[in-house]
């Protein structure tokens, strides 16, 4: 029996259709990968099945009493609560049961023998439920999940409103896993996780007995935990049994078969039309022409989906920089307290350096310190001459009400509208996306708008903080190619070895200089 059933679903935003009469089912224990290019509607689908969005048409039916857990990175965390408090909120229904049990105990003092027996039965039922749901080992469960996702390193007594976006996501994911719902809905859970914690989450999901729906552009991760694919493309939702690689094989075969059938049909249509045109006027052949016309009219025409624009990234070079990019002398980074021991680092022209290591140890802080956005606690940074820097930040917090055209135009006022549109199209954005406000775009589309601005700026140093977060497989592959081709210097933070190992001329393990206990 289906835990979730979606029938005849259609939805769109304005004149932009997202889904057209699609169906979906989820059975107990299925591990589903929901895949598709940026902007095809994966997150929209999640919002519809969780009731955050009302579909234009169609039915969404959950089986009764099913508990659904959704990793929503926009959840507001209550000020004044510690990480531990939020994680223990996962068991709020058990604490409510304990409260109910304590109230029953209070009633026992005044109960007659018959009432007492009834109350003891009620207490027994609650006691069993608490025991079966690990109520008496909650603290150790919280500690176990917190360790697995690296929250213990941050400190469980820390106020949740002081956390970075990545740390907030970890807290929300940990709470969700502690809730153990019948269904997990995970929208890009690895975006803010480092390699160690991605590996932990991978093992957790591989052993997860219940069902989940996972959106992820990290293909090795996705492939290791799913047994079913739903592919979102051209307003359709198609089911494939197997992992991502098996899906790609079947998808390519189906695509080739459809193209061959389309070509054959187009040839037949051309021949029929030609026959009708040549023979409809003659009395002797008019009946045959009418017969061919009827065949044409009844024909189910095969339609090929319009090819989505593939991104093309070509970074504009600035003049050659000096030999030195930067050199640090006894640099100590941090805000209120040190995040590093004194650092003596040097980068020279042409180097492509990937920084890796656990979350929260100061990788982003190091980048901002090298760029001069944060003052060091101690030591100094010497920057080279003729450096033209392009900086891609991991998080952009402010709401952006510009259209994509306005956003890029504000950076390049000398461009014509045609040039702006062409630049955005080269980043894989369609006309509908280009004319939309940045605030309504998906995470991947927003990243492409930011990349568009970076690509069209003249640079000889790229500083990139997790640039692949939210990018679909095509965009990620094209970005990798463009960075390998780039003639300047690169300083890159990434949690994906599959991405950075092909680009980097050397890697720096930031765990070797952090003051954090790992």
Curated annotation (Swiss-Prot):
Keywords for the protein's UniProt record, in alphabetical order: ATP-binding, Nucleotide-binding, Repeat, Translocase, Transport
Entry's family note: Belongs to the ABC transporter superfamily.
InterPro entries linked: AAA+_ATPase (IPR003593), ABC_tran_Xtn (IPR032781), ABC_transporter-like_ATP-bd (IPR003439), ABC_transporter-like_CS (IPR017871), ABCF_ATPase (IPR051309), P-loop_NTPase (IPR027417)
Alphabetized GO MF terms: ATP binding; ATP hydrolysis activity
Gene3D superfamilies attached to this UniProt entry: P-loop containing nucleotide triphosphate hydrolases
E.C. number(s) listed in UniProt: 7.-.-.-
Domain of life of the native organism: Bacteria
Protein name from the UniProt record: Uncharacterized ABC transporter ATP-binding protein YfmM
Binding residues annotated for ATP, in chain numbering: 36-43, 357-364
Top enzyme category: translocase
PANTHER family recorded: ABC TRANSPORTER ATP-BINDING SUBUNIT, DRUG RESISTANCE ABC TRANSPORTER,ATP-BINDING PROTEIN
ABC transporter domain ranges (all copies): 4-260, 324-518
SUPFAM superfamilies the record matches: P-loop containing nucleoside triphosphate hydrolases
